[in-house]
């Protein structure tokens, strides 16, 4: 019965929600850092869980750390190669870095999996602007 209440993914998402609600930027940053600390603490135990890698990568994305975001999205895709959200975030990071080739590579993978994907259409529109 204790396993029912011990859900690390849920707790990590709760920490992120708390950070997102915070109005003070310094406190919000601190809460995101706390979420990262917790995420890294459970990462080894759940190393084959693509959700943990994805959530940690998303925190880095929110914080604007492109390198770490890509690292964790790549981990997510190593575990779950068909993760459309991870591919979309990777494409968005590469879009921000103005790396057209990598954006196109991610978009091509998304197209293979889901040609009508909403994120894909948005990313392709943004790609035309760079």
List the predicted regions and their residue ranges.
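Extended alpha-helical scaffolding segments
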Residues: 84, 88-95, 105
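Extended amphipathic alpha-helical coiled-coil/heptad-repeat regions
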Residues: 23-27, 119-128
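Alpha-helical adaptor scaffolds
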Residues: 17-85, 89
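Boundary/linker segments of alpha-helical solenoid repeat arrays
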Residues: 84-86, 113-124
């Amino acid at each position: 019965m204790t396993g029912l209440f011990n859900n690390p993914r849920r707790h990590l998402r709760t920490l992120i929600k708390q950070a997102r609600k915070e109005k003070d930027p310094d406190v919000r940053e601190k809460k995101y850092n706390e979420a990262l600390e917790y995420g890294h603490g459970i990462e080894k135990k759940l190393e084959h869980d693509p959700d943990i890698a994805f959530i940690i990568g998303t925190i880095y994305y929110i914080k604007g750390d492109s390198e770490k975001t890509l690292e964790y999205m790549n981990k997510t895709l190593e575990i779950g190669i068909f993760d459309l959200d991870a591919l979309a975030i990777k494409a968005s990071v590469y879009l921000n870095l103005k790396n057209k080739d990598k954006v196109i590579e991610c978009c091509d993978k998304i197209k293979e999996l889901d040609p009508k994907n909403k994120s894909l259409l948005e990313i392709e529109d943004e790609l035309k602007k760079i």
